[in-house]
Amino acid sequence: MVQIVPHVANAHMVKTSRKGLLALVVVGVEECCPTRRCDLRDPNLVVDSNCLLSRSTHQSSLVEDSIIINHFRILNFNNRASIFLCLRIGVICSTQSKMYGGKSYILKGSVSLSLIILILLVTTLLVSAKNQPRISLIEVKTCNLAKGEWVEDKKRPLYSGFECKQWLSNIFSCRVMGRPDFSFEGYRWQPEGCNIPEFNRVNFLRRMQNKTIAFIGDSLGREQFQSLMCMATGGKESPEVQNVGSEYGLVIPKGAPRPGGWAYRFPTTNTTVLSYWSASLTDLVPMNNTDPPHLIAMHLDRPPAFIRNYLHRFHVLVLNTGHHWSRDKIEKNHWVMHVNGTRVEGGYFKNVENAKIFTIHSLVKWLDAQLPLHPRLKAFFTTISPRHEKCNNTIPLSRGSKITGEGGSLDTIVESAVNGTRVKILDITALSKLRDEAHIAGCKLKPKKASNVTSAPTFNDCLHWCLPGIPDTWNELLIAQL
């Protein structure tokens, strides 16, 4: 039973009988208006990456799982006029049965159905009008977070590179490592057609209450993890944050310089943020051999054991790989490629790029099959972070400031892998490519004696980024999609 009611702030709503019912309920008609820009700063809405659907955050006055389509514009195609119908359409997905007095309700209220019928008739007339050679379409204003421009922002950086020593590796902290210029810190990413919400660490932790965020990948993923820790703590010393690495087996192995990852928990909100090192995102298993070099089976078609073992504990999973897929690195790590449990050499997998493509597609396919079993989990695959051939430039945006156009991601491998799946893309490649001045190149190598810091040589790393810096923007894009 479905009743349609006008969209009023105080409209009384009660729970529905939840037996897998999918109901589309028109809850109101606003006055005609032009298409508006999506604005992620609306405090009452949480808009996903395409700025089309927003989940209301009202508590008592709205049915759970209600999704609102903010607005859309129906065009007539004689190019003389446009009719704008601004509708609010509630989408209620019901899963559990609750009965009240032996009756089931979705919404309680009343409205004249003639108004709804009139709208449908007008729409039908527009579509079926005579002498209209073109097909009627619905034009929707979308928001592509990967398109936009870098703009100056006096509120940047989000934290201090000096004060966030608790979470930052020295090599990523360019202020600690003696970089002389920091103009690159004063910019934020402005998407085309919508706004990224201004980061607020208190609100972020509240939204992530009782949740676990996992970054799994290579050193770029570790940078993003360290960036988020600095953002969530405001870059301050935070002794109350707990080291819970042992819960995930993240302890320092005997003879190793560091653990395979880190896990920290904010006790006030029970929010856990962790990082796990898996440069290839493959399952690495020592082979049965005793003579050096100790070979490691690199199972291209199996996700890392860490993901398989702890996936059920994650609420947000962020994956990345790319820069360790070279013949040189594979041989230095003594990795031996396997597929279906069998060693593969030559043929298709002789080309390392083919092996990378196969691995990414295999992992995304596996993860997509797992997501229905973990409905609370949101999974993202980060596109590759660009390596610049030269990065001795210190002038921000000398390569330009805008990314425009209708094209897709520069990382076509990740884009094609996630296409049509439940795994979302975190597209950071193009916007990062504009920021060659923000790498850690130009920092000083750590001197043997503190007195020699000024004479220490610099190093030329055009892959990793200074923090604060570009990975902070990656996290803002991630949070906007959550």
Swiss-Prot record:
Transmembrane portions of the chain: 109-129
GO cellular component, one term: Golgi apparatus
GO terms, biological process: xylan biosynthetic process
Domain of life: Eukaryota
The keyword Translocase belongs to this UniProt entry's keyword annotation: no
Localization in the cell: Membrane
One Pfam short name: PC-Esterase
InterPro entries in the record: TBL_C (IPR026057), TBL_N (IPR025846)
UniProt keywords, alphabetically: Membrane, Signal-anchor, Transmembrane, Transmembrane helix
Topology versus the membrane: Single-pass type II membrane protein
Motif DCXHWCLPGXXDXWN motif, chain ranges: 461-475
Motif (GDS motif): 217-219
Keyword Transmembrane: yes
Record GO terms (molecular function): transferase activity
Comment field (misc): Contains 2 motifs that are conserved in esterases, but it is unlikely that this protein belongs to the catalytically active pectin esterases.
Role summary: May act as a bridging protein that binds pectin and other cell wall polysaccharides. Probably involved in maintaining esterification of pectins. May be involved in the specific O-acetylation of cell wall polymers.
Family recorded in the similarity comment: Belongs to the PC-esterase family. TBL subfamily.
Protein name: Protein trichome birefringence-like 15
Protein source organism: Arabidopsis thaliana (Mouse-ear cress)
Gene giving rise to this polypeptide: TBL15
